[in-house]
Amino acid sequence: KGSSGMMSMVAAAIAANRTKKGASAQAIRKYVAAHSSLKGAVLNFRLRRALAAGLKSGALAHPKGSAGWVLVPKK
């Protein structure tokens, strides 16, 4: 899977969290680790890159400030 695959996993992790404020990076990491074969440093690297790309493109947003929880913004 490419970066779009990781972005879809991040979006699925946020949706699975079922809270209005989104999901923490730790919760997203746990979800991706449980639902993919990525582990350790590779998982952390790909997750950081996917979060950064999603925030930059507007596909993801921080509900409060520039750190913490991440959510998929409403269109």
UniProtKB/Swiss-Prot annotation:
A cellular-component GO term for this protein = nucleus
Q: Where in the cell is it found?
A: Nucleus; Chromosome
Q: Name one GO molecular function term.
A: DNA binding
Q: Does the keyword Nucleotide-binding apply?
A: no
Tissue specificity field:
Sperm.
Residue ranges annotated for the H15 domain, each copy included: 2-74
User: What InterPro entries does the record point to?
Assistant: Histone_H1/H5_H15, WH-like_DNA-bd_sf, WH_DNA-bd_sf
Q: Which GO terms of type biological process are on file?
A: cell differentiation; chromosome condensation; nucleosome assembly; spermatogenesis
Could you list this entry's UniProt keywords, alphabetically sorted.
Chromosome, Developmental protein, Differentiation, DNA condensation, DNA-binding, Nucleosome core, Nucleus, Spermatogenesis
Pfam families xref list? Linker_histone (PF00538)
- Point out the coiled-coil segments of this chain: none
Q: Which family does the record claim for this protein?
A: Belongs to the histone H1/H5 family.
Quote the function comment for this protein.
Linker histones are implicated in chromatin remodeling and/or transcriptional regulation during spermiogenesis, the process of spermatid maturation into spermatozoa.
Q: What is the protein named?
A: Sperm-specific protein PL-I
Species this chain originates from: Spisula solidissima
Taxonomic path: Eukaryota, Metazoa, Spiralia, Lophotrochozoa, Mollusca
